[in-house]
């Protein structure tokens, strides 16, 4: 299979999966997007889902954001640790920049997993994402 494809098993598809990741995951904020990250149960897999509300803009703007995020994920999927990610856009009608999103993926996701591991270790396996503050990217 071509290395830059995005097969179905690399995508988060069901509402139940999205809810699990956003509720139990660690929030990381980049310059272009907000990521919720949880470790993956299956070794060798990194999965991603994208959520863009209608507040972001018209359909072509939402689709454009999703297209760029999917393309970035295709390029960095093999560099990321085993995890499940849900991506939300940051800001309204902000046009995504490929290079900034690429840096956000490479920097924020491993850091979020590292912090999630620390949080679970200190609280005995429980993670309360609502009480945790989001990790913000340096400006």
From Swiss-Prot:
Annotated segments matching region Disordered: 120-139
Top enzyme category: hydrolase
GO terms (BP aspect): tRNA 5'-leader removal
Catalysed reactions, semicolon-separated: Endonucleolytic cleavage of RNA, removing 5'-extranucleotides from tRNA precursor
Keyword Hydrolase among record annotations: yes
EC number assigned by the record: 3.1.26.5
UniProt keyword Nuclease present: yes
InterPro entries: Ribosomal_Su5_D2-typ_SF, Ribsml_uS5_D2-typ_fold_subgr, RNase_P
Keywords per UniProt: Endonuclease, Hydrolase, Nuclease, RNA-binding, tRNA processing
GO molecular function, one term: tRNA binding
Assigned GO CC terms: ribonuclease P complex
SUPFAM superfamilies hit by this protein: Ribosomal protein S5 domain 2-like
Subunit composition and interactions: Consists of a catalytic RNA component (M1 or rnpB) and a protein subunit.
Function in brief: RNaseP catalyzes the removal of the 5'-leader sequence from pre-tRNA to produce the mature 5'-terminus. It can also cleave other RNA substrates such as 4.5S RNA. The protein component plays an auxiliary but essential role in vivo by binding to the 5'-leader sequence and broadening the substrate specificity of the ribozyme.
Entry similarity comment: Belongs to the RnpA family.
Protein name: Ribonuclease P protein component
Species of origin: Chlamydia pneumoniae (Chlamydophila pneumoniae)
Gene from which the chain derives: rnpA
């Amino acid at each position: 299979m071509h290395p830059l494809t995005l097969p179905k098993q690399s995508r988060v598809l069901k509402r139940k999966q999205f809810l699990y990741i956003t509720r139990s995951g660690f929030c990381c904020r980049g310059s272009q997007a907000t990521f919720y990250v949880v470790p993956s149960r299956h070794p060798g897999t990194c999965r991603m889902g994208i959520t863009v509300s209608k507040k972001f803009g018209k359909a072509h703007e939402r689709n454009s954001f999703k297209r760029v995020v999917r393309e970035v994920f295709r390029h960095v999927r093999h560099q990321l640790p085993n995890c499940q990610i849900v991506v939300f856009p940051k800001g309204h009608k902000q046009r995504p920049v490929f290079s900034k999103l690429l840096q956000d993926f490479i920097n924020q996701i491993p850091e979020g997993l590292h912090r999630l591991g620390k949080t679970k270790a200190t609280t005995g396996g429980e993670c309360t994402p609502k009480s945790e503050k989001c990790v913000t990217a340096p400006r």
